[in-house]
From Swiss-Prot:
Single GO biological process annotation from the record: terpenoid biosynthetic process
Catalysis: reaction(s): 4-CDP-2-C-methyl-D-erythritol + ATP = 4-CDP-2-C-methyl-D-erythritol 2-phosphate + ADP + H(+)
Active site (UniProt): K8, D133
Enzyme class: transferase
Chain positions recorded as ATP binding sites: P91, V92, A93, A94, G95, L96, A97, G98, G99, S100, S101
Pfam families named in the record: GHMP_kinases_C, GHMP_kinases_N
Pathway listed: Isoprenoid biosynthesis; isopentenyl diphosphate biosynthesis via DXP pathway; isopentenyl diphosphate from 1-deoxy-D-xylulose 5-phosphate: step 3/6
Sequence similarity: Belongs to the GHMP kinase family. IspE subfamily.
Transmembrane segments: none
Protein name: 4-diphosphocytidyl-2-C-methyl-D-erythritol kinase
Function comment: Catalyzes the phosphorylation of the position 2 hydroxy group of 4-diphosphocytidyl-2C-methyl-D-erythritol.
Length: 280
């Protein structure tokens, strides 16, 4: 069974508090984009076999796909195994939920194969224990995500909008970014209600002008190159640019494919991982 596991971007990301266990409380708008990994999933007699086209991707228990299979099997008493070939296209450590999306896709397939009667809310609860982005990745589309990310509410679709995405040569540790974040020093928070109204109106310009990610306070300060990338994208005619997740990927919306293509072509000469795609 060949399936797609889509990347996500954050149209907004706000940190509104911190739980006693150290997890940060979030309020964010997530959006699926047409950039995806391919997973070829085959049931086998026993065990978990994972292969990947990228040599730097671990194929053992460090991989969220492995964790997803192991967790599902142990929770529901599945004795047979699974073989998974991953064709990795989503950049890693990029703020695009590549690993979480792969894990979410595998959980959905495991459910369909072994326990199709399993309610989605139970599958989502299982996914939360793997990673905070996994519940959203199971649902996808345009959604308001709250709590640590596990409370997902679908909102009006914001699909088919053009964007250019740049992932610089380095990765970022999500844990380190949150560890460095001082909530008391966040001066301007995203206005989520205004952003949702902009999404409801279908206005790409209004959405672009109201995007905000408070984690930029940490990641852009540590990596000034990201601010340069944002400015470059705007100079090419983007309506707005933002860092996705904890970074370092930067995306920008365009209302004209020609402008986006020119931007893509120029950025591709400077940065290795550049994509031109759409929201889905």
């Amino acid at each position: 069974m060949l399936i797609k596991a889509y990347a996500k971007i954050n149209l907004s990301l706000d940190v509104i508090g911190k739980r006693e266990d150290g997890y940060h409380l979030l309020k964010m708008i997530m959006q699926t984009i047409d950039l995806y990994d391919l997973l070829n999933i085959t049931p086998i007699e026993k065990g978990i076999e994972i292969k990947c086209n990228k040599s730097y991707i671990p194929c053992d228990k460090r991989n969220l796909v492995y964790k997803a299979v192991e967790l599902f099997a142990s929770n529901y008493g599945i004795k047979s195994g699974v073989s998974i070939d991953i064709i990795k296209n989503i950049p890693v450590a990029a703020g695009l939920a590549g690993g979480s999306s792969d894990a979410a896709a595998v959980l959905k397939v495991m459910r369909d194969i072994y326990i199709p009667e399993l309610e989605y809310k139970d599958l989502i609860k299982l996914g939360t224990s793997i990673g905070a982005d996994v519940p959203y990745c199971m649902i996808g589309g345009t959604a308001l995500c709250q709590g640590i990310g596990e409370k997902v509410t679908s909102i009006s679709s914001f699909k088919n909008h053009i964007l250019v995405l740049v992932k610089p040569f380095f990765g970022v540790s999500t844990a380190e970014v949150y560890k460095s974040l001082d909530i008391s020093k966040i001066k301007i928070h995203p206005n989520t209600d205004i952003l949702i109204n902009a999404i409801n109106s279908g206005s790409l310009l209004k959405v672009s002008k109201n995007m905000k990610n408070v984690l930029e306070n940490v990641t852009l300060k540590k990596h000034p190159l990201l601010r340069k990338i944002k400015n470059e994208l705007i100079d090419f005619g983007a309506l707005g640019a933002l860092m996705s997740g904890s970074g370092p990927s930067i995306f920008a919306f365009f209302d004209d494919m020609l402008k986006a293509q020119i931007c893509y072509d120029k950025m591709k000469t400077k940065y290795k991982e550049v994509f031109i795609t759409r929201t889905v």
